[in-house]
């Protein structure tokens, strides 16, 4: 180990930055974040440095560096493009016993500045010892995706209770186990969900009882349209800590594969005219699993609040006093349209966009047709495959031109994506002649005409299908 990883408290300490360019701006910003009193000296100052100086946030002097500037400084950073000046700063600082760092020159550094993941008060520092700053930045980027932003709030919460827990639980091992349950369980999830009062109440009860009870919770998570790269960080974190997952048929196999391997998987999907499990029973299955102390993942394709019946599920959970949180997902309209190269709004084609469901009821579609046939508007139809012919006929009958461009997207954003395009008059026959597999999405409006120019996503071994 070439360097000892340590954290310095420089709050209120005088720190000097020699240099006035973009590198100096980055160093000054970092020192300011840590609460240092920063002085900058350079013949010419970057406009950002000058702005900070004008606002009294730093002290800046437009002058050449002199040895006297180092006196009374806690640390010095040389960030000029003059290597001989940087070396001079290094030798003068070390001679006076002042910590010094020369930017991008490890051999003239008493300390190095790592790549930082900031979740204050939790700080993660990553360093390659100056060997490869790019590698350190790449590692930091990976860590940024793994550590929730709310860890800062969790750290502050833990700090408030540290002394009390130490007094209440005197055994080191017992205290460690207690903290592990707090920081990895439902109390931490309350913090992540912004429910600090509930977290405090649960921790107070745990302190009173001397143990952290196992409390179940439901995660209602949007799985997006299919491509696992479109999952949110929060969704992925909850997927990987669930004990049981209830999923529907709209969740792609690629997304389902990212759920914690040990989690029990229960299929509760629905197909047209066939329901595996009634919605009311799904609601109560979530309740029962949570009451067993399980972390319950309810994984839904797209977004749980857009034609996903998520509102019904959390209404039941709320009525049964089951803790829950909702994680939005990229809805199929947005995801499929983007991957098909069909913008839902466009200055020249559509100033509005409307989402509707195309499910048939007793062979009919109950929609507000007058609202749908407005000009310069895009219509996105979820679950519209079975009623596509009726949909197109009704739109034409209510005044929409038969030549209006229309598209059907099959299994959008995945390697099984297909795009069929036509018009209101021709699309039903085009689709009828193809082997189409759900889930599908129908897009209607002038924006569909842009598809041939804007289609960018290429399915492996198959070009997007334009069956006009």
UniProtKB/Swiss-Prot annotation:
The active site is at 248 (proton acceptor), 270 (proton donor). It holds the Pfam family CysG_dimeriser. Transmembrane segments: none annotated. NAD(+) binds at residues 22-23, 43-44. It catalyses: uroporphyrinogen III + 2 S-adenosyl-L-methionine = precorrin-2 + 2 S-adenosyl-L-homocysteine + H(+); precorrin-2 + NAD(+) = sirohydrochlorin + NADH + 2 H(+); siroheme + 2 H(+) = sirohydrochlorin + Fe(2+). Pathway: Cofactor biosynthesis; adenosylcobalamin biosynthesis; precorrin-2 from uroporphyrinogen III: step 1/1; Cofactor biosynthesis; adenosylcobalamin biosynthesis; sirohydrochlorin from precorrin-2: step 1/1; Porphyrin-containing compound metabolism; siroheme biosynthesis; precorrin-2 from uroporphyrinogen III: step 1/1; Porphyrin-containing compound metabolism; siroheme biosynthesis; siroheme from sirohydrochlorin: step 1/1. SUPFAM superfamilies: NAD(P)-binding Rossmann-fold domains, Siroheme synthase middle domains-like, Tetrapyrrole methylase. Residues 1-203 are annotated as: Precorrin-2 dehydrogenase /sirohydrochlorin ferrochelatase. Residues 216-468 are annotated as: Uroporphyrinogen-III C-methyltransferase. S-adenosyl-L-methionine binds at residues 225, 301-303, 306, 331-332, 383, 412. One of its GO terms (molecular function) is precorrin-2 dehydrogenase activity. The modification Phosphoserine is found at residue 128. PROSITE patterns: SUMT_2. Its EC number is 2.1.1.107, 1.3.1.76, 4.99.1.4. InterPro entries: 4pyrrol_Mease, 4pyrrol_Methylase_sf, 4pyrrole_Mease_sub1, 4pyrrole_Mease_sub2, CobA/CysG_C, NAD(P)-bd_dom_sf, Siro_Cobalamin_biosynth, Sirohaem_synt_dimer_dom_sf. The keyword Chaperone does not apply. GO terms for biological process: cobalamin biosynthetic process; methylation; siroheme biosynthetic process. Disulfide bonds: none annotated. Keywords: Cobalamin biosynthesis, Lyase, Methyltransferase, Multifunctional enzyme, NAD, Oxidoreductase, Phosphoprotein, Porphyrin biosynthesis, S-adenosyl-L-methionine, Transferase. PANTHER family: SIROHEME SYNTHASE, SIROHEME SYNTHASE-RELATED. In the N-terminal section; belongs to the precorrin-2 dehydrogenase / sirohydrochlorin ferrochelatase family. In the C-terminal section; belongs to the precorrin methyltransferase family. HAMAP family: Siroheme_synth (MF_01646). NCBIfam families: cobA_cysG_Cterm, cysG_Nterm, PRK06136.1, PRK10637.1. This is Siroheme synthase. It comes from Nitrosococcus oceani (strain ATCC 19707 / BCRC 17464 / JCM 30415 / NCIMB 11848 / C-107). The gene is cysG.
């Amino acid at each position: 180990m070439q360097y000892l990883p340590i954290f310095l408290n420089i709050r209120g300490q005088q720190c000097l930055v020699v240099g006035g360019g973009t590198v100096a701006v980055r160093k000054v910003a970092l020192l300011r974040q840590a609460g240092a009193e920063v002085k900058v000296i350079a013949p010419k100052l970057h406009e950002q440095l000058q702005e900070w100086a004008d606002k009294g946030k730093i002290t800046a002097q437009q002058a050449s560096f002199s040895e006297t500037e180092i006196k009374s400084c806690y640390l010095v950073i040389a960030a000029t493009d003059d290597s001989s000046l940087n070396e001079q700063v290094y030798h003068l600082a070390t001679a006076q016993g002042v910590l010094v760092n020369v930017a991008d020159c490890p051999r003239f550094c008493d300390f190095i500045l790592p790549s930082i993941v900031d979740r204050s008060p939790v700080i993660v520092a990553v360093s390659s010892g100056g060997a490869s700053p790019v590698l350190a930045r790449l590692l930091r980027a990976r860590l940024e995706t793994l550590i929730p932003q709310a860890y800062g709030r969790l750290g502050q919460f833990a700090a408030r209770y540290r002394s009390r827990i130490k007094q209440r639980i005197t055994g080191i091992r017992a205290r460690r186990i207690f903290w592990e349950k707090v920081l990895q369980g439902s109390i931490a999830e309350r913090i992540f969900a912004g429910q600090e009062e509930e977290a405090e109440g649960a921790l107070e009860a745990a302190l009173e009882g001397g143990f952290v009870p196992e409390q179940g919770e439901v995660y209602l998570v949007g799985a997006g349209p299919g491509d696992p790269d479109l999952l949110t960080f929060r969704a992925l974190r909850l997927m990987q800590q669930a004990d049981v997952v209830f999923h529907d048929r709209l969740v792609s196999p690629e997304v389902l594969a990212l759920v914690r391997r040990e989690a029990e998987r229960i299929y509760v999907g629905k197909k047209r005219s066939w329901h595996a499990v009634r919605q009311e029973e799904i609601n109560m299955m979530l309740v029962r699993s949570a009451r067993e102390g399980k972390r319950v993942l309810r994984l839904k394709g797209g977004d749980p609040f857009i034609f996903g019946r998520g509102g019904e599920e959390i209404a039941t959970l709320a009525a049964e006093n089951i803790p829950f949180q909702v994680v939005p997902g990229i809805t199929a309209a947005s995801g499929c349209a983007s991957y098909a190269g069909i913008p839902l709004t466009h200055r020249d084609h559509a100033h509005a966009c409307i989402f509707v469901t195309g499910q048939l009821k007793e062979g009919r579609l109950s929609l507000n047709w007058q609202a749908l046939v407005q000009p310069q508007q895009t219509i996105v139809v979820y679950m519209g495959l079975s009623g596509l012919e009726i949909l197109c006929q009704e739109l034409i009958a209510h005044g929409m031109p038969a030549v209006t461009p229309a598209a059907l997207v099959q299994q959008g954003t995945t390697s099984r994506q297909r795009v069929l395009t036509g018009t209101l008059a021709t699309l039903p026959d085009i689709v009828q002649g193809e082997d189409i597999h759900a889930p599908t999405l129908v897009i209607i409006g002038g924006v569909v005409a842009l598809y041939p120019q804007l289609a960018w996503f290429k399915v492996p071994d198959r070009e997007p299908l334009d069956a006009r």
